[in-house]
Amino acid sequence: MAHLLKTVVAGCSCPFLSNLGSSKVLPGKRDFVRTLRTHQALWCKSPVKPGIPYKQLTVGVPKEIFQNEKRVALSPAGVQALVKQGFNVVVESGAGEASKFPDDLYRAAGAQIQGMKEVLASDLVVKVRAPMVNPTLGAHEADFLKPSGTLISFIYPAQNPDLLNKLSERKTTVLAMDQVPRVTIAQGYDALSSMANISGYKAVVLAANHFGRFFTGQITAAGKVPPAKILIVGGGVAGLASAGAAKSMGAVVRGFDTRAAALEQFKSLGAEPLEVDLKESGEGQGGYAKEMSKEFIEAEMKLFAQQCKEVDILISTALIPGKKAPVLFSKEMIESMKEGSVVVDLAAEAGGNFETTKPGELYVHKGITHIGYTDLPSRMATQASTLYSNNITKLLKAISPDKDNFHFEVKDDFDFGTMSHVIRGTVVMKDGKVIFPAPTPKNIPEEAPVKPKTVAELEAEKAGTVSMYTKTLTTASVYSAGLTGMLGLGIVAPNVAFSQMVTTFGLAGIIGYHTVWGVTPALHSPLMSVTNAISGLTAVGGLALMGGHFYPSTTSQSLAALATFISSVNIAGGFLVTQRMLDMFKRPTDPPEYNYLYLLPGGTFVGGYLAALYGGYNIEEIMYLGSGLCCVGALGGLSTQGTARLGNALGMIGVAGGLAATLGGLKPDPQLLAQMSGAMAMGGTIGLTIAKRIQISDLPQLVAAFHSLVGLAAVLTCMAEYIVEYPHFAMDATSNFTKIVAYLGTYIGGVTFSGSLVAYGKLQGILKSAPLLLPGRHALNAGLLAASVGGIIPFMADPSFTTGITCLGSVSGLSTLMGVTLTAAIGGADMPVVITVLNSYSGWALCAEGFLLNNNLLTIVGALIGSSGAILSYIMCVAMNRSLANVILGGYGTTSTAGGKPMEISGTHTEINLDNAVEMIREANSIVITPGYGLCAAKAQYPIADLVKMLTEQGKKVRFGIHPVAGRMPGQLNVLLAEAGVPYDIVLEMDEINSDFPDTDLVLVIGANDTVNSAAQEDPNSIIAGMPVLEVWKSKQVIVMKRSLGVGYAAVDNPIFYKPNTAMLLGDAKKTCDALQAKVRESYQK
């Protein structure tokens, strides 16, 4: 039994079962009470934890004795962190004085201040510099270390074998801070990077101190000061820190590195990357560059020799682990620099990258100041000590995560990037035994290049899996649902008038559908502008509900007056903006126009109606029909350049006839007519003023703002109609229908109003263009929709006025909020779809007014606008290979995205300067320019137009290729180019130009990224997979003009940047285009 009990409790961790296995059972009788007294001997203790309790360990922080070393291994904050962990900390008196950490701060942090010998005899000693001979005592610091103790310091074991032997005699365990593996998990302990960061920054500060001019360029009354030119060699931590500091001070920064990734980082900081013509990768181990071939070094020397003659300051950081620093700049190169220049050698401690460097010294050689200090981190001792202290405290906590005991295990078998990898790499000596270097870790990640299937191949496979039966069934189901819906409308129709109105709505929608499909994409912007103006017919609803005398006398009349006022803004402003855009498309060779003659049909239509009205004829319905047909003609006229001005004129005639018929049908008294005229005149004046002053580049935000007015007018009209009609609801059999339409119109108007305002804010730069992805936004939108739909129940069930107006107010608030949440979640790149959707919304709001007021004109015009906006939205979505729901709900990815890991882009890019670009342009005979939103933002259309004119005069074939979603609204780029005088007949759409790229000599990509991204066709896992793009990479040569190699709005890397036929011309679009145009002009004038 005793054996069984021992077996059961052998693994017990309860404190009650202590010493059961080792306790002797004494012979003889035992008293029961005695057994209870000795019950503790019957319970086992917890398993003993490995390691030593923190409270039994002392961490020592000695003063650094290396010459001019001002750093200290632990800051007071670091001491406090270790004391909190449980360590006892002792600091040598004065250890932190040079770092501005007096002894009192250490005492306050919980440390004890002791002498040098007591500190070095601690269990764990932390230092900056490796132990060395103390000249005062004439003894080595290692001799004072506690036997079998632990040392954490910079060691450099490969260069200091004698030191390792000395430490081995003391059986020391050594953690070398310079050997921390450069893996992701160890970034917080990487002291080399911390110190290099400080060295890079300090190098720029010292250079600025010894340089005789400003870093930044200045224009003063005394003259112009050019910016300093700085070359930084080495794109490691120090080099990038130098680049960032120099760039922030306004210098022109150039960076060189043999590694492509480092050059990319230079670019991200705004520095100009330099490369040699010879392509060779310099990627080495541990984050360092490897030694390059003889041919590469020769090309490198040639580049450096040229740069020495141009730059003012040289900063070099090139190191090779375990070896002397390479000499990159000869004495002749340095002497070729301008007098007063400065060179800073961050590799001085390893011999230096300059032949003229004197390690540890600052001196002047033939007018060139040389800074060869080897203690740059020490010259910022406070900051350096703080970062080094953070590295050590984080390392100690990471290698020994136990809360009570200090313990870590050194393994020779470990995986790459794990904590075992960090420990084994850092520990260079264990209990006196040298274990440096560490063995190679397992599972080093390797990228196996796998050529994925193209998007077209995957789409073909997907299409092959869908049977004809499924396709036919889907189509039949859609038509069945549509016809069933028509039958349902017939059943619920309250009267014949409703059925007639639905018929009008349906026919107008069909006409609008076929009319808008015929509009050329170049005229999509004028189309949206003219529909904006026509949607101002919400004024008809406002006029119908206005009342009072010179001023409105009731709430409903005030709402109606306000609706009329803001609708008039839309009418006048929309037509004037449309006319301005159409005037831009006129070519010098076009025949003269006599558009004033369109006053004849306008005057006949309106004047004839007034004559008929005076004669006692009531022909308002015919007027509405005529106005509706004119609006149809307006949309149809904008299908081609030749009839576009007629279309705008027909729109004006239609709106004028509709307003005249409305006033004639109402027959207001003179006082009310004055109120109506005043509201429309004021609104029209404001609209004309805005339209006259607006810049064409700001057209998208103007359209969005005008959409908001339509939505607000619809809300006001619906609420006013409810207030006016409420007294008649009890006697009107169709009152329920009126209430439903009023509720629906209020909801649509609210969404249109707020959504348009958010779109305006994003386009104008008032709000961030990035999508606002609220947590749980889909649930929030679903809740708002459910609340809006649910609100109709009390609205219809309770006949009281208070409930009705409250429900309308609530749905207007809910829909307004929903418009904000929906539109805020959509990024700037999707604004073309947002604007077209809002355009469609405004049309449906107008339809609701038409049903509400039983007005054929509003129904016809609303159906036209609604269908045109829907079709444009569909065109935009097809151009991005995305569904409308995906865009509206703030989604990402195309319908073809496979969802796997995106393809990694390999290779190097080629950069050219303006002279190279001019030469390529001169040699090309066929040129295509593909602009993007970058051209719009920079307003670079004018220099490009002038460039096109020059090239055309030289006999070159120059055309433009426009992507449907380039810009921030449909057709925006076409209008901007027309504004600059580019003939519209050389501006082609994507479908027209794509087949011509293989025969094109040169393509200029200006400010475009996603719309020319080949990943859409090459990478099935890309979030833009399957998106139709301009296939510019198929041309013979491509010049991409961008600010940087950064991604576009879709945040997708662009493979064309690294294709062999692509050259990058980086810089601001406007400045680059201006300079390019000037250079081309200069080249042809020679």
Curated annotation (Swiss-Prot):
Residues that, per the record, bind NADP(+): 933, 965-970, 1007-1011, 1026-1027, 1042-1049, 1068-1069
Range annotated as the organelle transit peptide: 1-43
Chain residues that bind NAD(+): R182, V183, T184, V237, D257, T258, R259, G287, E300, L319
Gene3D superfamilies for the chain: NAD(P)-binding Rossmann-like Domain, TPP-binding domain
Residue numbers of N6-succinyllysine PTMs: K117, K224, K294, K331, K1079
UniProt gene name: Nnt
Phenotype reported upon loss of the gene: Higher levels of adrenocortical cell apoptosis and impaired glucocorticoid production are observed.
Residues with PTM N6-acetyllysine: K70, K397
Sequence intervals crossing the membrane: 475-493, 501-521, 527-546, 558-578, 596-616, 622-642, 646-666, 672-691, 702-722, 740-760, 778-797, 801-819, 833-853, 857-879
Pfam families listed in its UniProt record: AlaDh_PNT_C, AlaDh_PNT_N, PNTB, PNTB_4TM
GO MF: oxidoreductase activity; proton-translocating NAD(P)+ transhydrogenase activity
UniProt-listed Enzyme Commission number(s): 7.1.1.1
Chief location category: mitochondrion
Family: In the N-terminal section; belongs to the AlaDH/PNT family. In the C-terminal section; belongs to the PNT beta subunit family.
Organism this protein belongs to: Mus musculus
GO cellular component, one term: mitochondrion
Cytoplasmic side of membrane: 723-739
Protein name per the record: NAD(P) transhydrogenase, mitochondrial
Subunit structure: Homodimer.
PROSITE patterns: ALADH_PNT_1, ALADH_PNT_2
One of the GO BP terms on file: reactive oxygen species metabolic process
Keywords: Acetylation, Membrane, Mitochondrion, Mitochondrion inner membrane, NAD, NADP, Transit peptide, Translocase, Transmembrane, Transmembrane helix
CDD domains tied to this protein: Rubrum_tdh
Keyword NAD (UniProt): yes
InterPro entries reported for this sequence: Ala_DH/PNT_CS2, AlaDH/PNT_CS1, AlaDH/PNT_N, AlaDH/PNT_NAD(H)-bd, DHS-like_NAD/FAD-binding_dom, NAD(P)-bd_dom_sf, NADP_transhyd_a, NADP_transhyd_a_C
Record-linked PANTHER family: NAD(P) TRANSHYDROGENASE (PTHR10160), NAD(P) TRANSHYDROGENASE, MITOCHONDRIAL (PTHR10160:SF22)
Recorded topology in the membrane: Multi-pass membrane protein
